[in-house]
Amino acid sequence: MKNRILITGALGQLGQFFVKSLISKNNYVLATDIKENKLLNCDFEIFDIMDEERGDYLLKKYNINQIYNFAAILSAKGEQNPLLTWEINNAGFINIANLCLKNNIKKIFWPSSIAVFGRNSNLDLVNNDEPMHPETIYGVSKLACEKAMFYFNYKNLLDIRSIRFPGIVSNSKPGGGTTDYIVEMLYCAKQKKNYTCFLKDDTILPMMHVNDAVDASIKLMEFDKGAISLNHPYNISSFETSPSKWLEIIRSIGFDLNMNYNVDFRQNIADSWPKRIDDSSLRNDIKWVPNFNDFHTAKNIIDLI
C-alpha cells in the first residue's frame, strides 16, 4: 500500500474520478463528503470540512498521510451565495491545512481554477504568473487560497500541490460551474434532447478530459519536491473550444443535436476567463502531455453517458 489518502468532496465532479484512480494505483482511499454515498465502492465517511473535530477523528482513525481536498462551491453557484462560498472555500481550505499541521501530515492536493484570472490577465494566452483580478467570489476565494498555499509551502510548513483546472469534461453531472455547457451538450445529444446554451456561440474557453486532469494531478503529487519549481499552482490545459465548435464536433461523431442560445449571467463570468492557457511550466517540470484532444474527448465521454 503506497499511501493512505483522505479525499474530501469525493462524490463531486472531480472527486469520484480521483477515488477510482488512486485505488487503482495501490493506495488506500477514504472517501468523504457531506452527503450519503450511493456511488463509490470504497471506505466512506460523512465529513463536513468545517468540522475540525470530525476531521481530526478521521485522520487518526484511518492513519491518513495525504489529503486530496475537493470540497468547494463552484463559480455559478458561488455568485448566488457569495458569503457561504467564501466560508466553505476559504475556511475549509484553512481547516484542512490546520488539521494536517496538527496531525503531522505534509502532503495535500488542492485544485485551483482558471477563475483566478481576470480581464487584465492577457486572456488570449495566459501564462502562469499573469496579473490576477478575478471577478467572481469563486475566483477570489481560489486566489486567496493560492496565497495561503504559497505561504505554507514557502515556510516549509506543508507540501501543497495544485493545478489551475480549466473546464473538465466527464460523464458526471455538472455541479454549478460556468463550463457546465460542455457536458450538458453531450447529455442532450445522447438523450436526443434539444439544448439551450447559456453562453454565446463564439465564447472560447480552455477544457480538458477528466482522465487527463486526474493523471496530471497524481503525477504532480508523486514527483520529488525538488522537481517542483512552483510554490503556487500550475496552469494546465488540453484544448480550447466554444459552444459552436463543440456542436460541430458532436455532430461529426453522429449525434444530431439541436441547440439554441439564451445567454445568462455566466457569460460575464466566461468573458473574464482565459481563452488559451500556457501550461509549459507543468509540462516541463513533470513531463506531462494530455492524451485527449477535443474530438477524442467528446467521443469518449458521450460513449460513457
Where are these regions (language model features)?
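N-terminal Rossmann NAD(P)H-binding glycine-rich loop of SDR-like oxidoreductase domains
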Residues: 5-24
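Conserved Rossmann-fold NAD(P)-dependent oxidoreductase catalytic core, especially the SDR/UDP-sugar
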Residues: 94-137
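NAD(P)H-binding glycine-rich loop region in Rossmannoid oxidoreductase-like domains
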Residues: 49-88
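Mid/C-terminal beta-alpha module of Rossmann-like enzyme folds, strongest
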Residues: 219-267
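Conserved C-terminal active-site "lid" loop/helix of NAD(P)H-dependent oxidoreductases
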Residues: 210, 244, 264-289
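Amphipathic terminal alpha-helices
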Residues: 279-281, 292-305
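NAD(P)-dependent short-chain dehydrogenase/reductase
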Residues: 150-204, 210-214
